[in-house]
Amino acid sequence: MKKKIAYVGIDLLFPVLEALVANGCEVIELFSCPTDNVTEFNTRITSYANSEGIPLKMERITEVDLARLKEKGCQLLVCGGYYYRIPVTDAIPMVNFHPSMLPEGRGSWPMATALLKGLKSSGITAHKIAKGFDEGDI
């Protein structure tokens, strides 16, 4: 039986969604947010939702959304680049993929920050979603 997940994010970390699907996860709902389509995009997320017939919400995810996901049997919420704080609940496990090594790369522009700090390497961090941005257990 496939694990039912919800995915929250933009195109920057679309490969996370691709990997989840390739490994047998069933995406029951997608969430994204408006982007400027200059430096950040959501065209791959929206195209995927349309081609697969998956519901897509382009607004902040709310506690009502989380309750609906739980009712639909969602077993995991995965985030890969999202501008808004996600309400924390114990009803659904939640994980975020952040495009830097935490805690050093905290913030909304981690790759630019790594360059400005002169870091020689960086990476990606998976962590539990907590009340504060980029604060959950790694």
Annotated model-derived regions:
Residues 28-35:
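Short internal beta-strands
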Residues 22-27, 88-91:
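Short, conserved loop/helix-junction motifs that constitute active-site signature segments
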Residues 19-22, 41-51:
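Short, aromatic/basic amphipathic alpha-helical patches
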Residues 2-4, 94:
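Residues that mark the start of a beta-strand
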Residues 63-73:
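Short amphipathic alpha-helix with an adjacent loop that forms part of the alpha/beta core around
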Residues 55-61:
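Short acidic-hydrophobic, aromatic-tinged amphipathic segments that line or gate anion-handling sites
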Residues 4-23, 35:
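N-terminal beta1-alpha1 ligand-phosphate binding loop
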